[in-house]
UniProtKB/Swiss-Prot annotation:
This is Small ribosomal subunit protein uS9. The gene is rpsI. One of its GO terms (biological process) is translation. Pfam families: Ribosomal_S9. GO terms for molecular function: RNA binding; structural constituent of ribosome. PANTHER family: RIBOSOMAL PROTEIN S9, SMALL RIBOSOMAL SUBUNIT PROTEIN US9M.
Length: 157
């Protein structure tokens, strides 16, 4: 093998790290994959296993926990993108933040759990941004201001 061929092979490995070592599924003894997701101050612990497609959040069905259809749709996005809707039973415990932050945390955790269960789904989920932690949090209030950026009303006289 010449130096040029060796360099090309090395360059292809470094540009595509997933080709170097195929990831193995991370599944526990019960056949479940576990992951955590975060969004704002919400932390979601997500377990997935093959099943009929039920989603249980804090011991309640998703229709009961999230009354707004937009939030339920947000949770189901990773399953829809990967064509796995109705194939996995999802059990979630989530705490902190509000309903929107919790839905975002569940979506993040579910996406990570899907990649742990089936590593081949990572290239499908990554372009949609489901595996990226959304780092936006509330800006703190500053002294001398009414809110984070809003000033008190100014009076000339």
């Amino acid at each position: 093998m010449t130096d040029a061929q060796g360099f090309d092979a090395l360059a292809s490995l470094s540009s595509n790290p997933e080709a170097a070592a195929p990831a193995e599924p991370k599944i526990d003894a019960q056949g479940r994959a576990y992951a955590t997701g975060k969004r704002k101050n919400a932390i979601a612990r997500v377990w997935i296993k093959p099943g009929k497609g039920s989603i249980t959040i804090n011991g309640r069905d998703q229709e009961v926990y999230f009354a707004r259809p937009v939030l339920r749709m947000m949770i189901a996005q990773p399953l829809e993108v990967t064509d796995r809707l109705g194939q996995f039973d999802v059990v979630v415990t989530v705490e902190g933040s509000g309903l929107s932050g919790q839905a975002g945390a569940i979506r993040h955790g579910l996406s990570k759990a899907l990649t742990y269960y089936e590593p081949g789904l990572r290239p499908v989920l990554k372009p949609h941004g489901f595996l990226t932690r959304d780092s936006r949090v509330v800006e703190r209030k500053k002294y001398g201001k009414a809110k984070a950026r809003r000033s008190f009303q100014f009076s000339k006289r």
